[in-house]
Amino acid sequence: MSEEFELDTDDLKRRMDGAMANLKTEFASLRTGRASASMLEPVMVDAYGSMTPINQVGTVNVPEPRMVTINVWDKGLVGKVEKAIRESGLGINPQLNGTIIMLPIPELNEERRRELTKVAGQYAEHARVSIRNVRRDGMDQIKKAKADGMSEDDQKFWETEVQELTDKMIKAVDAALETKQAEIMQV
């Protein structure tokens, strides 16, 4: 009989949480027709010789549901920030007002909303696959321990623990997807 097997469920949970955090980051990059400061996170500006996130060259605000403003701290960077936004692929047309760049967020049409819900679904499926891969790793560890002499009861206990953790995380992914799809389809 081997010594007592102890599965590191904290490691499995941490890895599953990582998949969930990645999903939330991907969801934040989807434009929903509502203004949000996070929609500019992937946009980088060539400032002072290096690529810099927009929130490090100015203050990003959301004064209205369909407007984002950026108050650029250095007047010399206003043109570069505007260019970075135009070239970002967000489909936003910046308007200059001194050192303030205004970004009116256009209304999404029905077809684009449906496309975005499909993309959100793909992101969620990638997260589910990542979570299932972590589950498989945990189950493989349990099988290895079983081969090394783990009792049948211990095997069932650990398999149940891993499955319950997986089910909980998959439900969280599904809930996040449902929320994001409702947000995208909201006119």
From Swiss-Prot:
Q: Which UniProt keywords apply?
A: Cytoplasm, Protein biosynthesis
Q: What Gene3D superfamilies does the record point to?
A: 3.30.1360.40, Ribosome-recycling factor
A Pfam family it matches: RRF
A single Gene Ontology biological process assigned to it is: cytoplasmic translational termination
Its subcellular locations are:
Cytoplasm
A GO molecular function assigned to this protein is:
ribosomal large subunit binding
Q: Which GO terms describe its cellular component?
A: cytosol
Q: Belongs to which family? A: Belongs to the RRF family.
Q: Which HAMAP family match?
A: RRF
Biological function: Responsible for the release of ribosomes from messenger RNA at the termination of protein biosynthesis. May increase the efficiency of translation by recycling ribosomes from one round of translation to another.
List the PANTHER family hit by this protein, alphabetically: MITOCHONDRIAL RIBOSOME RECYCLING FACTOR PSEUDO 1, RIBOSOME RECYCLING FACTOR
- Listed name of the protein: Ribosome-recycling factor
From which organism does this entry originate?
Ruegeria sp. (strain TM1040)
